[in-house]
UniProtKB/Swiss-Prot annotation:
Reaction(s) this enzyme catalyzes, per UniProt: a ubiquinone + NADH + 5 H(+)(in) = a ubiquinol + NAD(+) + 4 H(+)(out)
This protein's UniProt keywords: 4Fe-4S, Disease variant, Electron transport, Iron, Iron-sulfur, Membrane, Metal-binding, Mitochondrion, Mitochondrion inner membrane, NAD, Oxidoreductase, Primary mitochondrial disease, Repeat, Respiratory chain, Transit peptide, Translocase, Transport, Ubiquinone
Name the UniProt record assigns to this protein: NADH dehydrogenase [ubiquinone] iron-sulfur protein 8, mitochondrial
Cofactor note: Binds 2 [4Fe-4S] cluster.
Domain of life: Eukaryota
Stored Pfam families: Fer4_7 (PF12838)
Recorded name of the encoding gene: NDUFS8
UniProt-listed SUPFAM superfamilies: 4Fe-4S ferredoxins
């Protein structure tokens, strides 16, 4: 197979453009030339301005100082972040944070030991034990949540018929040991007592959509 040099290839393309495809519109050589890129063509000669710009970028680090100038300009602009933990952003009423067990205003715990939350939990993080009381009602004797298993899906809160188990607004509950993340009933009730005002406000704000 004979290799065509660049001049020969250009002449062949020009002849094909003048002849045109059968029954079709003829192609202009300029359009053909613009369509193809010839890898063996030499780069066009650079003028003095291009040489000067390239030398300035290489020797004077103009791009570096341009980037530093942009960085320094942000020192005089309004910050886009907040000064956490001294400042905190707003949370959605549907925010799913640390778990809590709620009480009625009388002080009676809401949980009726139906175990729907335990059954629906996809991570199997909830363990409940219950026994009947003298009045025939059921109350939990054990309510444990392994917070290291929890995926914060909110299914337990959605399944609860009495709004007993909720995921409250608190997200700052980091610990130093694994045992501190094994919540029992007392810990969950204490969380509910601590965050009841915020939890009730969030439920009230979201009740139309539940």
């Amino acid at each position: 197979m004979r290799c065509l040099t660049t001049p020969m290839l250009l002449r062949a393309l020009a002849q094909a453009a003048r002849a045109g495809p059968p029954g079709g519109r003829s192609l202009h050589s300029s359009a053909v030339a613009a369509t193809y890129k010839y890898v063996n063509m030499q780069d066009p000669e650079m003028d003095m301005k291009s040489v000067t710009d390239r030398a300035a970028r290489t020797l004077l680090w103009t791009e570096l100082f341009r980037g530093l100038g942009m960085t320094l300009s942000y020192l005089f602009r309004e910050p886009a972040t907040i000064n956490y933990p001294f400042e905190k952003g707003p949370l959605s009423p549907r925010f799913r944070g640390e778990h809590a067990l709620r009480r009625y205003p009388s002080g009676e715990e809401r949980c009726i030991a139906c175990k729907l939350c335990e059954a629906i939990c996809p991570a199997q993080a909830i363990t409940i034990e219950a026994e009947p009381r003298a009045d025939g009602s059921r109350r939990t004797t054990r309510y444990d949540i392994d917070m290291t298993k929890c995926i914060y899906c909110g299914f337990c809160q959605e399944a609860c018929p009495v709004d007993a188990i909720v995921e409250g607004p608190n997200f700052e509950f980091s610990t130093e040991t694994h045992e501190e993340l094994l919540y029992n009933k007392e810990k969950l009730l204490n969380n509910g007592d601590k965050w009841e005002a915020e939890i009730a406000a969030n439920i009230q704000a979201d009740y139309l959509y539940r």
